[in-house]
Amino acid sequence: LREQEAGTADRIRLLEARGYPAYTTSAGWLGYDDAKIARLCREARDQGFSAIKLKVGRSLEDDVRRCRVAREAIGPDMPLMIDANQVWEVDQAIDWLNALKRFDPFFIEEPTSPDDVEGHRKIRQGVAPVRVATGEMCQNRILFKQFITRDAIDIVQIDACRIGGLNEVLAVLLMAAKYDKPVWPHAGGVGLCEYVQHLSMIDYLVVSGTKRGRVIEYVDHLHEH
């Protein structure tokens, strides 16, 4: 924290002037037809989102088609992430993800059981350079410690409600900074989309001191329900 103190005022000015990059999952919900995915992806790009995320895991054939639709809509340079919501076994995840590599996914989120540290580590080794992200189901900093120190994940996804509040979040932010792991907080619910913005601002201003390789999640369509 003391190391970052000197640049905090400059970072505040930059944050006020330029904001913080964000991605959306609203473009890629399961059940959307191809035309809707393409339209929402283009809208997200035009609205200034830095990346989009698709849900995957129901059918490999469907995932190949949907990833192709999304990639064609956003172009080759915009990051495309995918989220399996814990649906795969470890070896199945590796095979499935290697089949989707042609679409250049930036990361795979929750590829398997959220408590399986060694499973995530094996997946990470088996699908590189695709990054592995998880953490929304982690209930405390100790489980995050296992994922981080075992080098089982590339991206730390804190869910501030599930982990039990700001003090526990701060512990994970500090741990992630120590091991140079970017934090992308989970925001898949009403209210969380607003909450995580503050967590990421804290991380940028006083903990990690950087926005490099970091974005916040915004899932706007959940506000409609």
Show the residue positions of the predicted features.
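N-terminal capping/lid subdomain adjacent to the active-site entrance of alpha/beta enzymes
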Residues: 1-80, 85-103, 225
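Shared catalytic-loop signature of beta/alpha-barrel
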Residues: 39, 104-107, 115-225
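Hydrophobic side chains within alpha-helical segments
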Residues: 66-69, 112, 220
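Short, small-residue-enriched loops and turns at beta-alpha junctions
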Residues: 30-32, 56-63, 84-91, 109-117, ...
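General beta-strand structural signal in soluble alpha/beta enzymes
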Residues: 25, 54, 80-82, 109-110, ...
